[in-house]
Amino acid sequence: MSTGEGTAEQTATGTPAQNGRESIPSDAIREEYENLSDLIRKYRFAYYQDDAPLVSDAEFDTLFRRLEEIEALHPELVANDSPTQEVGGEASAAFAAVEHLQRMYSLEDVFSIEELEAWLNRAEASIAKLGDGTAQAAWLTELKIDGLAVNLLYRDGKLVRAATRGDGTTGEDITHNVLTIKEIPQQLSGEGYPSEVEVRGEVFIPSKAFAEFNEALIEAGKAPLANPRNAAAGSLRQKDPAETAKRPLKMFVHGIGAREGLEARSQSETYALLKEWGLPVSPYFEVLEARADVLGFISKYGEQRHKLLHEIDGIVIKVDDFATQRALGYTTRVPRWAVAYKYPPEEVHTKLLDIQVNVGRTGRVTPFGMMEPVKVAGSTVEMATLHNQDVVKAKGVKIGDIVVLRKAGDVIPEIVGPVLALRDQQDPPVRDFVMPTECPACGTPLAPAKEGDVDIRCPNGKSCPSQLRERVFHLAGRGGFDIEALGWEAAIALTQPAEPDVPPLTSEAALFDLTREDLADVKIRREKRSKGVATGEYELVPYFYSKGTAKSPSKPTASTEKLFKELDKAKSQPLWRVLVALSIRHVGPRASRALAQAFGTMDGIRAASEEELAHVDGVGPTIAAALKEWFAEDWHREIVDRWAAAGVRMEDERDESTPRTLEGLTVVVTGSLPNFSRDEAKEAILVRGGKASGSVSKNTSYVVAGESAGTKLDKAEQLGIRVLDEDGFRLLLDGGPAAVGDAAEADGGDAPEESAALQEEKAAAVEETA
């Protein structure tokens, strides 16, 4: 997946440049922004945590770039939890979480030679301003391996830990599995290695080895693996290292993170040292000074990409000199000294067999294409979203068409359009897609939520099984109750099983009342496989219980037992997670935290007036109205009441001993603080009544700047906003504005009141829990 697969070394932070003319976002823009944020988080989770992409790189990149475009025009929408402010995915709960000594960054992506040249122009202009104005760059140019980013930690030459990248700050401890990869030395060789060093690289499965491994799986009657990247990621997440050892994994290292006592001056010099220490370094890199040579490198490997040792999804271009890298610095997500060029997407032709629709958790109806399975860019694709009926019309596709399917960036499927020259040759003849007028799941008439909406929705939130399935899947997510055993297939089994006729759940209200006996007879339809290959035939299989025999009676599976343990654990989740789990439109993690902080109890939130809700910083009128509308429904209140009766915690334990020193203040933290992680700093602000913002504006009270602070610090200085270091931040936390010499802020005299319009804009920055 793009916008996050490459890694970068060194440390610093900043914020993306905000370009374009600012204006108040319309309701349509706000809704588009919320939907985009929701989709991108969903697709990232599937890619990084499940190793099972739901969409192609092309579609993901398009969605991500549109999100960046909206944020550039409306910077007030940017929140700390925006996908543009995050790196990759979170650490999985299945492995111990470990913090990297130095953050692992993403890379900025460009998708054409024109975009690359524009990036090079900007970088070269910045480099020319350094020193005496005559500096020039040498570019280390290398292949972008399509694998899993891994961080190796060596102490005194001994490998002591290996971790996935995770969110860039915290990854998963996969040391035991990495030890099975023969190319990775457990003890560095040679001399001169640092007493402590993080080595970054990419674990992958060579293309030929992947094909041979899949052939062996099929011969053994097992399902083949989807593609080398997902296979490598899945191999490193095996609970049994012996299983990992069976996979043909390799690794190439491409940089370093934290280190003690290393005097390397450049990326290429570091590669030479890594090789001397016995680490596997890719042979596919060159240090180039002329731009024409960089473009020649791209052209050369573009022609050879399917003949290489491993799959690639682009070319990485880095400034070779470390001093120049440090001078150029970082944004919050990417280095300014490196870029990933993505090759034009591979395209294939396949038949569009049907266009079906899916009903989401807020009733939104989305068409998607079902195609003859076809292999493109290393994986088999048979589905691709078509977003809405207007997109279907704009693409001009008809059911039965031969269509152009591509994977831009080499990883999410996109239907580009029909092959018109073949349309008249199709048998049976092609036919138009007609958007249904009734919900395919419950039969309720469909309609736009309001006049002029492109999307149509099913208004039957209470009884629509598709909406219930999607809500149950959502509430179990990492932002909600975090129930790992309640995945997509389990949500289907609970809400839409093949048997019995009445599902275990007809409302999420009953979730915490489930018993093992309720699940004993549940069966789902699962496709039969022959030697690992799908047959197109289906059978009914028990989902929550094992198949019983005369000698071994049916009993709950290990996954079922895990589900009940996690349901019990979920009851003690904090209030904000319960709010997220309720699928209230517009109420995402940011608003939920603000509401929990302001009211402390679910009863307090329910009883609050719309005006009181809107007054909460980070909520505003849109979210306040959505809350009142949601609680006005009897069946919604029943969910809360039954969860509470089952023991779900509906209030937060409030530490009254923590002084509310930041009441009414907005604080922005930028750069690296020695004694606070970003989350710790945010939590310290919130518990003292302040707002932890991700962007600097005239309404910002203070900016806390750590090492390598970026453009947020520049903007604070331009606006005349007080800037504090970590010591000043501690004083502010303990004693409020007066402790740092700001009497006016302490009195509240100069604090501007927020207009209704400003609160409305804040509401739009919250992801739609839809």
Swiss-Prot record:
DNA ligase that catalyzes the formation of phosphodiester linkages between 5'-phosphoryl and 3'-hydroxyl groups in double-stranded DNA using NAD as a coenzyme and as the energy source for the reaction. It is essential for DNA replication and repair of damaged DNA. Pfam families: BRCT, DNA_ligase_aden, DNA_ligase_OB, DNA_ligase_ZBD, HHH_2. Keywords: DNA damage, DNA repair, DNA replication, Ligase, Magnesium, Manganese, Metal-binding, NAD, Zinc. CDD domains: BRCT_DNA_ligase_like, LIGANc. GO terms for cellular component: cytosol. InterPro entries: BRCT_dom (IPR001357), BRCT_dom_sf (IPR036420), DisA/LigA_HHH (IPR041663), DNA_ligase (IPR001679), DNA_ligase_AS (IPR018239), DNA_ligase_CS (IPR033136), DNAligase_adenylation (IPR013839), DNAligase_N (IPR013840). This is DNA ligase 1. Residues 759-770 have a biased composition (Basic and acidic residues). Residues 1-27, 741-770 are annotated as: Disordered. Residues 744-753 have a biased composition (Acidic residues). The gene is ligA1. Its cofactor is Mg(2+); Mn(2+). Residues 1-18 have a biased composition (Low complexity). Transmembrane segments: none annotated. Its EC number is 6.5.1.2. Residues 657-746 form the BRCT domain. GO terms for molecular function: DNA ligase (NAD+) activity; metal ion binding. The active site is at K144 (n6-amp-lysine intermediate).
